[in-house]
A protein has these predicted regions:
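Sec-dependent N-terminal signal peptides of Gram-positive bacterial secreted proteins and lipoproteins
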Residues: 9-26
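Catalytic loop of the DD-peptidase/beta-lactamase superfamily, centered on the K-T-G motif
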Residues: 31-61, 200, 242-474, 478-480
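Short, surface-exposed loop or secondary-structure junction motifs
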Residues: 33, 64, 118-331
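Short, conserved catalytic-motif segment at the N-terminal edge
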Residues: 36-79, 99-101, 108, 156-163
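Short active-site loop at a secondary-structure junction
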Residues: 67-128, 165-178, 249-252, 504-507
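Alpha-helical transmembrane segments of polytopic membrane proteins
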Residues: 454-462, 524-537
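Juxtamembrane interface at the cytosolic side of transmembrane helices
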Residues: 464-502, 551
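Juxtamembrane boundary at the C-terminal end of a transmembrane helix
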Residues: 575-584
């Protein structure tokens, strides 16, 4: 089998080189030393480019931007977003066997417990789900955890974490890790096998991929799992820590060597993972176009990149919580480029190597005849539910006066991150930008100012409550020891309301921190009751303020504090209503 020959060849050459018997270049595999200080982050990246029987390995070990010693490609890394290609391949295999129709409703392949546990606003097809067009907003539960005991099963994940649909299916591309997990759940249900078992039986073993783990806990390959747990990962500041587990299984959970990734990539471009050539051809056929109606955008989950004059390259690239990975596939000549990294921070090496192998990037505008300055947001966002406030974090400003936005158009985040190409469209005075995995459209500056201002006011209310509680306790004790005969009746409501605001905001922050890392829906639901308490108690406080507090005889200072807390109570109610934090 061709992929096995490549694997044996790469492994043998690397081992001999590491033992010092031969240089890798003597065996026809080029080890490229790249001394460009393009990245100032600690960590390393490993690249494998395979074209026919020729394999080129580029190992970049970075310490403050300098290339150091050789790094073995047999080290274990997170595959990050490349994990999704195992899911897409599994779906295409079942489609090939006639067990799945890509244009049928996803619900036709779901078990009864899922149908009774999840109710989507609009129906969507398997193909729409593969192309990230099911309309889902971003997911904020069960993303990462450092404790494998916190991992949840795929059955529980797809029910507990079902996001709201904020777009009509088929109208907008919004990359969805949940959607990938739902596809895997479908594969699991149709094949009557656990997803990791299905992949091992139908992809890993046939290709000879022994150095890959699919399951979130990595118990399906304990040797690789142990190596992964011993590895180090680096953040933006060059600080390292232990690897995380991803409950977004299997969208982000796969770990393995870049060598195994290259074997999988070869299996895709050669069609070895499929029984029929027609299945491979369909897999590499564009299924979503850009707004111009001519430029390929997605091919059954894979992004379509434009290199050179007429060179369409398929694959994906992106970052996880602590790493980044990429895979590019040339279906015409069978060449592949794979990359894994133990640093989250993006850099320009990916762009450099991909263009070196496939040709210069094309299709990205160098300048624009019109001013596109303004505030924008991505389709990969949260705009519905208890954490809808996070939507403002997904907005950004483009200012043409500060320079042309070529970096934005090349990367999507106002910097040239991954070389993801995008297209700009102006229609009816509205600006829209499209990238492979998401759309970008204007965001109301007025709404941004309103929501941001409300956040600032809530922060001030929290600080006031934080101060008033200990001050109130001090005054209470002082009066107690001074034998104060008459305590203002309304003062107790004032202190209770201060405590309500304090815990309202404290639990609110706890929920946010938990939800954005490894929080569970159950935790969020429990914490959400603080919203009920906050809004009810705030209403009660306002009623008593009008009926009792404003009439009470007390100092001007104390009366002023009563009214300030009344403002804070009203703010809690407005904040809750605007951000849709109520559970009904």
């Amino acid at each position: 089998m061709k992929s096995k020959r490549i694997k044996v060849k790469i492994a043998a050459y690397v081992c001999l080189a590491l033992l010092g018997f031969m240089t890798i270049s003597q065996f026809g595999i080029k080890v490229k030393a790249d001394n460009d200080t393009m990245s100032m982050f600690t960590g390393n990246e490993v690249y494998i480019y395979v074209n026919g029987d020729n394999a080129e390995i580029s190992n970049i070990n970075l310490e403050n931007g300098m290339v150091t010693d050789f790094v073995s490609p047999e080290e274990v890394y997170s595959w990050g977003p490349v994990s999704a290609l195992l899911v897409y391949t599994s779906v295409m295999q079942l489609c090939e066997q006639g067990k799945i129709d890509l244009d049928a409703s996803i619900m036709e392949y779901m078990p009864e417990e899922f149908k009774s546990g999840v109710k989507f606003t609009s129906d969507f097809t398997v193909r729409q789900l593969m192309n990230h067009q099911a309309g889902f907003q971003n997911v904020y539960y069960y993303r990462y955890t450092s404790n494998p005991a916190d991992l949840v099963s795929l059955d529980k994940l797809v029910i507990d974490c079902a996001p709201d649909q904020i777009f009509m299916p088929g109208t907008t591309v919004a990359y969805s890790e949940y959607g990938i997990c739902l596809l895997a759940y479908m594969v699991q249900n149709v094949s009557d096998m656990n997803f990791d078992t299905y992949v091992k039986t139908n992809i890993l073993e046939p290709l000879g991929m022994t150095d890959t783990s699919v399951r979130a806990s990595h118990e399906d390959n304990t040797y690789i799992g142990d190596l992964y747990r011993e590895s180090k990962y680096y953040n933006y500041n060059g600080e390292y820590g232990l690897p995380y587990y991803s409950s977004m299984y299997p969208a982000l959970s796969v770990v393995g060597t870049v060598q195994d990734m290259a074997i999988f990539a070869q299996g895709l471009v050669s069609g070895e993972v499929f029984e029929k050539e027609s299945t491979k051809e369909e897999f590499f056929t564009p299924s979503v176009l850009y707004l111009d109606g001519a430029t390929p955008r997605l091919a059954n989950g894979m992004a379509v990149f434009k290199y050179g004059d007429n060179n369409e390259i398929y694959g994906t690239v992106g970052t996880g919580m602590i790493s980044r990975a990429g895979m590019l596939l040339n279906a015409k000549d069978g060449s592949v480029l794979c990359m894994v990294s133990n640093q989250y921070a993006p850099n320009d090496y990916w762009n450099k190597y991909s263009q070196e192998k496939f040709g210069e990037m094309s299709g990205i505008a160098e300048s624009f005849p019109e001013d596109i300055s303004g505030r924008y947001t991505k389709s990969v966002m949260i705009s519905s539910g208890k954490l809808s406030f996070l939507g403002i974090l997904d907005t950004f400003q483009i200012d043409m006066a500060k320079g042309k936005p070529i970096a934005f158009l090349a990367g999507g985040d106002l910097s040239n991150i991954d070389g993801i190409q995008g297209k700009l469209f102006k229609e009816g005075g509205s600006t829209q930008m499209q990238f492979a995995y998401y759309d970008i459209f204007p965001y109301s500056s007025g709404m941004f100012i309103l929501k941001t201002g409300l956040f600032i006011l809530m922060a001030l209310a929290y600080m006031y409550a934080l101060i008033s509680i200990p001050v109130g306790a001090f005054i209470f004790l002082k009066n107690r020891f001074a034998n104060e005969k008459k305590t203002p009746v309304f003062r107790k409501y004032y202190y209770i309301q201060s405590a309500v605001i304090f815990f309202y905001f404290l639990f609110f922050l706890s929920m946010c921190m938990s939800a954005m890392s490894s929080g569970s829906p159950r935790f969020t639901t429990v914490v959400s009751f603080t919203y009920y308490i906050g809004i009810v108690m705030s209403f009660v406080y306002l009623v008593f303020l009008v009926r009792t507090g404003r009439k009470e005889e007390c100092s001007v200072f104390e009366k002023g504090n009563y009214y300030i807390n009344g403002y804070n109570a009203l703010l809690v109610m407005v904040f809750t209503l605007i951000y849709k934090l109520l559970l009904f």
